[in-house]
């Protein structure tokens, strides 16, 4: 997925060496949430400075293929205000990068047809959890919702990446219901089938590589368990599924 924050220089150098592509992202998460028009108080000048610093430091890393302005902003409640905030940052990113890499903003809003900001980016990146947070456990309904949304994004005529999707999975728990390893595989097979039907979808980035700790809460069973690997890097069934899937892409 997009990085959610600028990676360390050491990590970017490792990605350069190993051929791992990176979507470099400013640490701007959830901008535009709350209030009648929250973009009136959004920190545009500071955001521009952070973007400037990130591109100045990291522009020479060949692993970076895409700049992301931020993650999961509210871009549909006040569409014009959102566009007025994000579009100058989009132009700034193109101005700053001598290689003129494409620029994106990762969207997550449910009323995507009202959004005028995400469609204006060079690449459409969307985070979607049909079958998990929405339509929980109902993979047939999740597939229908995913196909309906992808039909909409096809009209935008931009390369599209499903930049987050996943299901919490407790390693060693088996069955057909949510939180089992089997459900995680079925979930990914269901959503990936929707993506494979659409040639404008150019990428998929499962959330997440490995389980990680979070604050306690009723939605977290000992942290975020959406990893393809456990916290100590042991593969779940989904890791083997994706290895086979991606190896077949090479053919």
Predicted regions and their residues:
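A short, acidic, amphipathic alpha-helical segment used as a generic capping/interface helix at domain edges
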Residues: 188-193
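Short, well-ordered beta-to-alpha junction loops that form the rim of enzyme active sites
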Residues: 107-108, 164-166, 208-209
